[in-house]
Each structure stands twice: as C-alpha cells, then as structure tokens.
Swiss-Prot record:
Catalytic activity: ATP + H2O = ADP + phosphate + H(+)
Alphabetic keyword roster: ATP-binding, Coiled coil, Cytoplasm, Helicase, Hydrolase, Nucleotide-binding, Nucleus, RNA-binding
Domain annotation Helicase ATP-binding: ranges: 284-459
Gene name, Swiss-Prot/TrEMBL: DDX42
Molecular functions (GO terms): ATP binding; ATP hydrolysis activity; RNA binding; RNA helicase activity
Disordered: annotated segments: 1-119, 131-155, 182-203, 642-682, 723-753, 794-944
Subunit text: Transient component of the SF3B subcomplex of the 17S U2 SnRNP complex.
Predominant location: cytoplasm
Motif stretch (Q motif): 253-281
Protein name: ATP-dependent RNA helicase DDX42
C-alpha cells in the first residue's frame, strides 16, 4: 500500500482513498496512475462514510457504480452499498503478479468444472476410504489373539436358522398350492394339471424285419391230459374258475404240472409257495401256451406271480441282449407303488436266471433310469408316461419286446392312460404275447382291452369285482363324523396288537388332519398320499413293511397293488368313491390265504354307498346287519331294485278295481286287517257304485286305479256275517272297467241252505249276471223267477275281458256259451300279477297279507265269494251245491282264470276259462238274451 504525499494531480493519503489526518477541509485522494490497489475504493468509501454529508468524490467515476444519495432512496443506501461490494469482482491490474495468479487459477477452475471428472474423483475418494477401512479391519483381526474362528464364525445350522428367522414364509408355497386344489362332487381331489404326455407316434411294422421267436412252452402233464372233459369242468368248478375263449388249456392243480425247471422251482419253494392259487392254476398254462389272456381275479389272489413265472421262461428262450437292445418283457402298471412292488418280485424270481429288471416310474431320477436302461435289462416294469418319455429320448426302444403285460389295466384306463397304453401296444411288434390282469374289469374297458389282444382267453376267478372272502368285513354306522374319531381312538390300540393297521381316507387334506390328530394321541404312524415326494413315499412304505410303524394313514394311492403281509386290519375311515375302489382297499389284508378284518365306518350321509356295500357283502357271503340294510333302503334306486322278500303274491282272480278294499295310506283311515268282523253285516241292499263313465274309462284307470272305488252294505235280513269264500256266491265283473260288484244266482244260493247269501238272494231276488261293457252296465235285481241274464254291451268281450268270458252268443274257450241259466262270469282286470290292484291288503283265516278277505259285497273276496270251507286257493273249495264238480287242470295257470262260467248242473274242465257247470245245467239257449227291464236303483256317488 503506497502513501501519497499529495501534490499536483495526486491525492494525499493511502492508495485506498485516504482520509484527513488533521481536521480541516477534506481532500479527495488522488489515485496513482501507476498502480491500482484493491483498497482504494473501500478506503474512499470509509472516508466518506465518516465525514459529514456524502459528496461525490472525483475518483469514484472509474469502474464503480454511482451511489444513489437521494433522500427517497436513503432507506436502500446500505443495501445497495453492500450489493455494490458483492457484485463488483476483483480484477487485478494487468501485468501484476496478482493478475498472473488470477489467470492461472481461472484456468484450473475451468478444468475442474467437468462433471464427469468431478464424479470420478468422488468415486475414487470413496473407494480409497473403503480400502483404508478394510485394511484397518484386517489389521485389527491380525492383532487379535486367543479367538477361534470355528466358534465365532457362523456354521451351516446357524446360517439355516438365521435364514428361517429372516424368511418365515420360506417353503409355504406347497401349502398354498394345496389350498388351491379343486374337488369334484364326491369330494375327491382333482389332480392338478400335470405335463401332458403325448402318445408315441404311429409306427409301420411292415418296414421292420423282426426276428422270429417262440412263445409256446407248455408241455401238458400226462395226468392233466388224461382228464376227461367232465373232470376238467369239475376241476374248474372246484377252483371257481370260468374260462372262455378258443381252445383254452386245461388247468394245472400243482406246481409239478406246470413244467418249470429246477432253478425256478427252487426259487418258488424258497419263497414259501406250497400250492398255486386258482388264477395261477389256469393263468400259468395259458401264458406258457403263448396265448393272449384277460385275467380277472380278486385282490391278493396271486396275479403277479401268474405272469412273472411264464415271463422268465419266455425270456430265457431268446438270445441275450446286445448293446443298444431294449427289453424283452415290459410290464405296465398304473401307480409307482405297484411298479416298485412288481419290480421287487421280478428281481426275486429273476435272479435264478441272472435276469436284470429296471423300474421306470414318474418321480424317480430320470438320469439313473436312463442309465440303467442303456446298460441293458431284460425286464422293464414301468408306468405309461415315464416309459414314453424314455422311448422318445432314445434311452431304450421296444423292438425286442415280445412279452407285454398290463396290470390293473382298468385302473390305467380310468386314469386317462388309454391313448398312452394303446400307443405302447402299437409300438410293440404285432405278434407279441399280451396279458391283461386286474381285479375288476368293466365291459367298456374290456372292449378297449380286446382291441390290443389277439384271440384272448378270458379267465375269471370268482365274481368280477367281488370282495375277498378271506377278509371279514364289519360295518359300523355312526350318527356323525366325530363319533368315528371316538371309536377309532378307543379301538386302535387293540388293532395294532394283532398286526399292522391301514387307515384309508378319501381326501389328502383329511389324511393329513387325521395323521396329526393321531400323533397328538402318541401314536406312531406314517402318512402316504399322492403329493408326497417319491423318496418320502418309498421311505414310509419301507418302514411300514418292516413294521417300524404300526399304523399307515393313506389315500387311495395305496389301495391298489400294495402287498404287505403284516396288515391285519384295514379301516375305511372315509368310504371309497366306488365299490371297485372299496374292493381294492379291503384287499390290502387277507393276502394269499391269510385272514384279515376290514372295518367300514358309515354315517347317514353315506346311504348311496351303502347299497353297493350291501351287495358286495352278500356276494362275499358276509353278514349284512339290519342297520346297514335300513341305511341302504334310504337310497331310492336301491330300494326300487331290491328284491322283495316274504311270501309270494297270489293272482287276482276277481275283477280289478271296484270291490277291493282300499289300501291303508291311499284313502282309508285305518286298516281292517286285524278285524275279522265284516262291515258287510250292516248293509241292507246292493249298492253298486258304477257310474255312466264308459267314455272316461282311461281317465278312471289312471286316476283311481289304486284307490277305493265303492262301498257295499250287506243285503242280509238277519245281518249274518258273510265269509270270504264259497263257490255259490260268485261275483260279477264289469270287464274292462275298474268295478267288480258281487252278485249271486238265486237258485244257486238256494241250493246251499247254509250260505247266508242264499237267504239274501231269496229275499231280494238276485240272479247272477255278467256285464262285459262299461261302468254304465249296472246290475239290478229282478224277482227270483228270473234265472239269470247276461248283458253284453259289446259283441264279444271288451278290452279288459279275458278269454273264456261267458257271454251270450259267444262260446267261451274250452266250453259252450254261458247264456242262460245263471251264467256267472269272472273276469280278471289284468293278468299281471304285480299290478297295483293285486297289492290290496286282505284279511282272512290266516290274518296275513295274502289271505282271503271279506269285501263290501257278497263274493267280493279275491279268490272266493262266500264262506270258504276248504283249502282251495282260487275258490275251488268244497261247495255245498249238489253235484258240482270242478278240476283245475291249469296247475300254475293262475292268471288265466278270468272267464270262469259257473252254471248249475254243468261239469266241464277248461284249462283257461275254467268253466264250471252243474249236472242239472240246461242246454245252450237263447233265453240269455231275454234281459228283463232292470228296476230303478239308488244313485251312486260314482254316477255322473
């Protein structure tokens, strides 16, 4: 900072503006022309600020903003001065060191303003700081002493627990999928859509040259050959076998007659087989003969061994496998468990010939199965889908297959494997040998199976789908579901003491719930259902076979093919979806002749299944409790189709319709079955209630066929009780109608003084007559002098009139015309023994349902007309008319007694008409046409 002494052209003071040292007139400092100081302006301003009123200095004209000293702007003076100080940049003088430094800094600032370089600089700084921090940590660890890393560091278990604590929802995806499962109307889970397995493409076998092979190895034993056809039939009947097909081989009754070699016989004896089962007796000769077969037998009957033993002989006759060859025998089954079980049987018997077997099923390792197939195996036990996958991936081929077996074929068709099964069969050479085995075989599925067989022999042991008689079935009925749980917990310890217990549940969710509840009761058990991993399923089944766990809770996935001899009790906690599944369920016990017990727990809502269960029990000669039968009777289809027990029903001899006592529940207030006092003791005269409704006959039949049509009161003077059968008082019938009004011949009843009808007829003058017309043909009662008349509304019998009707001018079948002397005709309304008119409750001597009854009219009984004094069923008892002779030559011709003519003095035998005539009968005359004018009668309630 320079000091200016003042002088011409220069101001006195420092370079920043100067101020007066001594009081007096202020002088403006004079700026040096040679140098420029930054303090000049500030100094000048400060000097002026300390002095009196502001004045405009002369040096303030260069490079500065002129200050506003107006009074109105005095308020903003300080702010503007501050702004002026801030806004004015510092510019050093040219060629000064400060200017040079300023220029160099501005150049540096221009380079630092690049944003990318600034960002990279920050990144590098942060990285440097991080590296330094890591180095510090490493130094701290190196300096630390006495610390074990294996304790301080996190091991696998701690890492797992930490992960589960941080992720509590890990592994819950499966449960969510289970909740999304859909169920059908029966409550069975609908399997989620899996990978669709396309069938194998078609193949043209004509382009492939197959080597010849032999498939008939059966040399019939001489003892079997010596049997006569009758003895063969008796042997099959003894074994409960039904064989159909072209020239089936004869059955063998022992292993020695099968022609097995010593190696196989040794293995069979080692497996503790003593005698072949019935299906083996017939199935082994058929399979060894090279014939295609359909084998149907109950569960546990030895079907597996029946096709494994001939298969081994079939394989040993062919040349050994070469590298790249496929199997010789293929066994296809529906489930993984059955696949593994058959595979173990094949290994057991196949080791006698060093034959290799491979199990190929879904859920197993694809790579391991493919490797085993490529190494070569004579026997492949598989499920359809996985075999197709391996064939498509060239892991194996079916060119050498000559022995093809479908076990549980109906189950595969039911599961939707029909196209896969057909494609597998179409890929095997056409001249193969094919065998189908199952416990049940429906007609539709059997037709599908016959399409892949050639001239098959069908072997049925027992009834198709019947239950095993070695299994004792016990049905328990409970009022509700919780009652089943109480019963199970109370009896389960008892069941486990006798052997392993298999509990079947329909739904997978119910199986898990039941298993959890039993575990809370401290029961050791296993769980098996379709959604479990294959390794878990294998582990559970293995433990159950080894008796490691005494109880297994399973769905129907374990219902087929599971062969565990230790199972002594099967409990159907939930009923099966159909009777075939029930048959397979209970077949898990009682295997190979062993005895077992199967419990089925029912509730009232299971009435639909109860009907099938009743028939299943009856087919297996099992006891059917009354409670179960009552529950089954709640099902309408079972109640309608159930056979009717009790005594057989007698035919309806009288006309159907009016004249029958009303059935209880169909209009009558009470049943008179227990009361032997007839209401006919009260009536005063005949009151037949037939109205003029001939044109409405069809409507009357439909509307009133099962209801009471008319009431009659006794025409007796002394109110005597009338019986239910006496031949003298025959009833008249309005043929074709619903009415049956009893009448009587006066002379006929007069001949029998013991009959109360005689007195009634004598008093009232009632002859017998026949009306074969409509309801309008109403009988009236002329004097006794009139012998009888017959009124035919039609030329012959009407639609309801049966053969042999004694009508005037028409001769009945087997006899002369019934015109004239008291022709009494009975017509049956219908020859159907089961018609609703026949099912009328009656009361008679026996008091039973089918005994004779007294109706509201003389002779209104079904089989007789007055007192019955004998044992004749159709009113053919001893009669008190003179010289009467009748013989029923029809025997069982009970429905053809409609047109019965009974006349005095005629004796005739007719098989159908049963015309009865007295010895005093007159010849056929035309006086039957002389119908007297009927007197007026009281109006009936049926008259329109």
């Amino acid at each position: 900072m320079n000091w200016n002494k003042g002088g011409p052209g220069t101001k006195r003071g420092f370079g920043f503006g100067g101020f007066a040292i001594t009081p007096g007139k202020k002088e403006e400092p004079k700026l040096s022309q040679q140098s420029h100081s930054a303090f000049g302006t500030a100094g000048s301003s400060a000097a002026f600020a300390k002095s009196g009123p502001p004045q405009l200095p002369s040096f303030y004209k260069i490079g500065s903003k002129r200050a506003n000293f107006d009074e109105e702007n005095a308020y903003f003076e300080d702010e503007e001065e501050d702004n002026s100080n801030v806004d004015l940049p510092y510019i050093p003088a040219e060629n000064s060191p400060t200017r040079q430094q300023f220029n160099s800094k501005s150049a540096d600032s221009d380079s630092d303003d690049d944003p990318l370089e600034a960002f990279m600089a920050e990144v590098e700084d942060q990285a440097a700081r991080d590296m330094k921090r890591l180095e510090d940590k490493d130094k701290e660890k190196k300096n630390a002493k006495g610390i074990r890393d294996d304790i301080e560091e996190e091991d696998d278990q701690e890492a797992y627990f930490r992960y589960m604590a941080e992720n509590p929802t890990a592994g819950v995806v499966q449960e969510e999928e289970e909740d999304n499962l859909e169920y059908d109307s029966d409550g069975n889970p609908i399997a989620p859509s899996k990978k669709i397995i396309d069938p194998l493409p078609p193949i043209d076998h004509s382009e492939i040259e197959y080597p010849p092979f032999e498939k008939n190895f059966y040399d019939e034993h001489e003892e079997i050959t010596s049997l006569t056809p009758q003895q063969v039939v008796e042997l099959r009947h003894k074994l409960n076998l039904r064989v159909s097909g072209a020239a089936p081989p004869r059955p063998g009754s022992s292993f020695a007659r099968f022609g097995f070699d010593e190696q196989l016989m040794h293995q069979i004896r080692k497996s503790e087989y003593t005698q072949p089962t019935p299906i083996q007796c017939q199935g082994v000769p058929v399979a060894m003969s090279g014939r295609d077969m359909i084998g149907i037998a109950k569960t546990g009957s030895g079907k597996t061994a029946a096709f494994i033993w001939p298969m081994l002989i079939h394989i040993m006759d062919q040349k050994e496998l070469e590298p790249g060859d496929g199997p010789i025998a293929v066994i296809v089954c529906p489930t993984r468990e059955l696949c593994q079980q058959i595979h173990s049987e094949c290994k057991r018997f196949g080791k006698a010939y060093n034959l290799r077997s491979v199990a190929v099923y879904g859920g197993g390792s694809m790579w391991e199965q493919a490797k085993a197939l490529q190494e070569g195996a004579e026997i492949v036990v598989c499920t359809p889908g996985r075999l197709i996958d391996h064939v498509k991936k060239k892991a194996t081929n079916l060119q050498r297959v000559t022995y093809l077996v479908f076990d549980e074929a109906d189950r595969m068709f039911d599961m939707g494997f029909e196209y896969q099964v057909r494609s597998i069969a179409s890929h095997v050479r056409p001249d193969r040998q094919t065998l189908l085995f199952s416990a049940t075989f429906r007609k539709k599925i059997e037709k599908l199976a016959r399409d892949i067989l050639i001239d098959p022999i069908r072997v049925v042991q027992g009834d198709i789908g019947e239950a095993n008689e070695d299994v004792t079935q016990i049905v328990e009925i409970f009022p509700s579901g919780p009652s089943k749980w109480n019963w199970l917990t109370r009896r389960l310890v008892e069941f486990t003491s006798s052997g392993s217990v298999l509990l079947f549940v329909t739904k997978k969710a119910n199986a898990e719930e039941l298993a959890n509840n039993l575990k809370q009761e401290d029961h050791n058990l296993g769980l098996l259902h379709g959604d479990m991993d294959q390794s878990e399923r294998n582990k559970v089944i293995s433990e159950f076979k080894k008796k490691g766990i005494p109880i297994l809770v399973a769905t129907d996935v374990a219902a087929r093919g599971l062969d565990i001899p230790s199972i002594k009790t099967v409990i159907n906690y939930d009923v099966a979806r159909d009777i075939d599944t029930h048959t397979h369920r209970i077949g898990r016990t009682g295997r190979a002749g062993e005895k077992g017990v199967a419990y089925t727990l029912l509730t009232p809502k299971d009435s639909n299944f109860a009907g099938d269960l009743v028939r299943n029990l009856e087919g297996a000669n099992q006891h059917v409790s009354k409670e179960l039968l009552d529950l089954a009777m709640q099902n309408p289809w079972f109640r309608k189709s159930r056979f009717k027990g009790g005594k057989g029903k007698k035919p309806n001899i009288g006309g159907g319709g009016l004249g029958y006592r009303e059935r209880p529940g169909l209009g009558s207030e009470s049943s008179d079955r227990g009361n032997n006092n007839s209401v006919m003791s009260n009536y005063e005269a005949y009151k037949p209630s037939s109205g003029a409704m001939g044109d409405r006959l069809t409507a009357m039949k439909a509307a009133f066929q099962s209801q009471y049509k008319s009431h009659f009161v006794a025409a007796s003077l002394n109110n005597q009780k009338t019986g239910s059968s006496a031949a003298g008082a025959s009833g008249w019938t309005s043929a074709g109608s619903l009415n049956s009004v009893p009448t009587s011949s006066a002379q006929q009843n007069a001949a029998n003084p013991d009959s109360p009808i005689a007195a009634t007829a004598a008093a009232k003058g009632v002859p017998g007559f026949t009306s074969t017309g409509t309801l309008s043909s109403v009988p009236t009662f002329p004097s006794v002098g009139v012998q009888g008349y017959s009124n035919n509304s039609s030329a012959n019998a009407s639609a309801g009139n049966r053969e042999g009707v004694g009508s005037a001018g028409s001769a009945p079948r087997g006899g002369s015309s019934g015109g004239g002397g008291g022709g009494i005709v009975r017509e049956r309304y219908s020859d159907n023994r089961n018609s609703r008119h026949n099912e009328v409750p009656r009361r008679g001597e026996g008091g039973g349902r089918y005994n004779d009854v007294q109706h509201h009219g003389e002779g209104g009984g079904r089989y007789s007309d007055a007192y019955r004094h004998g044992e004749g069923r159709h009113g053919d008892s001893h009669r008190h008319a003179e010289g009467r002779h009748f013989t029923d030559t029809g025997g069982g011709n009970r429905n053809n007694v409609d047109g019965r003519n009974i006349s005095e003095g005629r004796s005739n035998e007719s098989r159908n008409g049963e015309n009865r005539k007295d010895a005093n009968s007159r010849d056929n005359k035309t006086d039957g046409f002389a119908v007297p004018e009927p007197p007026k009668r009281k109006k009936s309630r049926w008259d329109s």
